[in-house]
Regions:
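Conserved N-terminal entry element of GNAT/NAT acetyltransferase domains
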Residues: 9-34, 161-168
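Acetyl-CoA-dependent GNAT
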Residues: 26, 30-96, 100, 113-115, ...
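Active-site acidic-Proline motif in GNAT/NAT acetyltransferases
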Residues: 100-106, 134-135
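Residues forming the Rossmann-fold NAD(P)(H) cofactor-binding site
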Residues: 110
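Conserved GNAT acetyl-CoA-binding A-motif
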Residues: 120-132
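Conserved beta-strand-loop-alpha-helix junction that forms the acyl-donor binding cleft
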Residues: 130-139, 157-161
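Conserved active-site tyrosine of GNAT-family acetyltransferases
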Residues: 143, 148
Length: 168
């Protein structure tokens, strides 16, 4: 354990202790204690939660590792967007990228992706992947506008702990 690291506290770098991006309308920063309920409500409003994924567990897991975090965007002191970001040392992945339905079309999604990319670049990561659910065609065009394109690999999956599977 790091010196000064308190049990139950997530280790934070200098990067995570400051706002990532701040503008006249939007401030993007790492998730803070007390933000969890608002972030989960945002994910639910955006249709990102699934019965087999416990969003509170996903948040805790991402926050408990130095190679991942959850970024949030605030407008008028309300959480209006998020991006979960992590990496394996050279390849970064973004999950739960979303903007509150009432706030879409204001450029917040672009700013969230840019903040997640900046988070990865600061850690020496040079490639970013996005996870997009099958059938979510509307968001694919958005990501293509940002320079993302279908890759040459296909994601395959296996539940290695069947008890966690739930109803797919």
């Amino acid at each position: 354990m790091d010196p000064g690291h308190k049990a139950g506290m997530t280790r934070r770098s200098n990067f995570k202790d400051r706002a990532l991006m701040s503008g006249s309308e939007l401030t993007i920063r790492p998730i803070a204690e007390g933000d969890e309920a608002a972030v989960i409500a945002l994910w639910q409003a955006c249709g990102l939660t699934r019965p087999w994924n416990d969003p509170a567990r996903d948040l805790a897991f991402a926050r408990g590792k130095p190679s991942s975090d959850v970024l949030v965007a605030l407008a008028d002191n309300r959480i209006v967007a998020s991006a979960m970001v992590g990496h394996d040392g050279h390849r970064g992945t973004m999950y739960y990228v979303c903007v509150a339905p009432a706030e879409q079309g204001r450029g917040y999604g672009r700013q969230m992706v840019a903040a997640a990319e900046a988070w990865l670049k600061e850690r020496g990561v040079w490639k970013a992947n996005l996870l997009v659910r099958t059938g979510n065609e509307a968001v694919l065009g958005f990501y293509c506008e940002l320079g993302y394109e279908p890759g040459s690999t296909q994601q395959i999956e296996k539940w290695i702990d069947p008890e966690k599977r739930g109803d797919r």
